[in-house]
Amino acid sequence: MKGEILASIVAMSAILGTSSLACTTILVGDKASNDGSMLVARSADSKAIKAQVFLIHPAMKNQTGMHSSKAHDGANDFTYPLPKDGMRYTTIANSHTKLHGAVGYNEAGVGLSGTETIYAKDELLKIDPYNEETGITEDDIPDVLLPRMKSAKEGVKLLGEIVETKGAGEGFGVVFIDANELWYFETGTGHKWIASKIPQDEYFVTANQGRLHAYKENDPNFMGAKDVIKFAIDNKTYDPAKDGEFNFTKAYTRDDERDVTYNYPRVCWVQSMFNPSLKQDFADGQKFPVFLKPEKKLSVEDLKAAMRAHYDGTAFDNYASKDEDKKNIYRAISVFRTYESHVMQVRPWLPKEIGRVTYVALGMADLSVYLPYYEGLDGFIKGYSDGSYDADDTSIYWVYRKLQTLVMTDYEKYSPVVKEAYAKFEKELAVKQAKFEDEYVKLYKKDKKKADKLLNEFSKKTMQEAKDLTQELTNKVFTMLTADMDAKLKSLNKGKKD
């Protein structure tokens, strides 16, 4: 029996855990949210075994030398000078390299989420290729920028300078957020890029494709490489006389049949969630609005729901649909190979220790639980800094991933058990969290040290409770799976007694 169970799990993992890189990103302006906060959601998708670790990088003084990707077994041989005085910052990083921090804040309250893998036109990459050997990639962006950037705009400017001088090692989109502004950065080719400030009363969604259209030189709402428009004109991907206003996506971004089934549907689905009256077809990706005012103000819960989406309730549902012809046509947001997803929330009116919070779900969001990780945290419970690409009994990543792998052997039967338990946990946690934050603010005004102690006690208790629940659910699902396997093997025995 044990052999059949393991074989089933391995086969399912092979099917669901492909190596394709993909992410989905959502940004929400403060006047588009229900409480005046700025919100960022992103899924990080690659390999299901890509265990993550939670890191707190201490402030550093009088540094010399270089940051080296190669020294950490990173993507290439990118190097960059270390800042003389580096700020404290956090990342959720690759367990193997301790690089590729998916999300984090620094002590100045500036946050970053990256990257969104995007693709440029082949004809332009032949002229201005990615610098794959020594250009900057998602492996190094957080560890270069977070210790030194004091605002979102400064982060955009610095990354742009690096792309223009050292080159991008790949195509990417990056989110920058601070107390006042929310920016999205996209590469075009190896040395071309633009960035746009997100309108306060609108939201933006992207899925593995360049999505920024407008770009205006000398406009404070935009930044970009100095010759980004001229390069497109010179290489005949933009003709002002014929095309009218410059469109960065149209000029620089790959757009073909792959995007129709892989990328467009995710953008369309999120926009339909937040703007139900909007009527558009999955295939009309180039017509989707870039920025939209939501029909109702958006919350953290709305973004969690988007990160968990898989065309729920339709024939295209990747996991629950009975229509085998339509079930896997379109790529869902929540996929098994997601190794983490997060929702960043910035509330400038609160002390930054709790005003900057990231809700993180490890593994597949649809079968995981979102926990709040405050910027004021000084540590984690055991297992958060452990992990590798091999399953173990210590890593917090594998606590969640083991349960998800079991559930995917029979999603229809086992997923309701997990989803109902996690929904109940999150609902109860929201009540506890509101009470904690109220207590924290009152205590912060009198005694910051005691307030920070309260923050860490609450956070670590939450981590432990979620871990305990997950282990209970793993045992419950494993018991169900064992009983199912027993029944299956007995039926194969044609009613004969063992």
Predicted regions mapped to residue ranges:
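A contiguous strand-loop segment
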Residues: 23-138, 158-285, 289, 294-295
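Short, well-structured alpha-helical segments that form the helix of a local strand-helix-strand
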Residues: 155-164, 303-307
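Substrate-recognition/cap regions that form aromatic- and gly/pro-loop-enriched pockets
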Residues: 316-445
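Bacterial N-terminal signal peptides
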Residues: 8-17
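Accessory, solvent-exposed terminal regions and/or long lumenal/extracellular loops of proteins
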Residues: 260-327, 331-336, 425-445
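Sec/Tat signal peptide C-region and signal peptidase I cleavage site
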Residues: 18-22
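Histidine-centered catalytic/metal-binding microenvironments
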Residues: 418-498
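Bacterial N-terminal signal peptides that target proteins for export
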Residues: 1-8
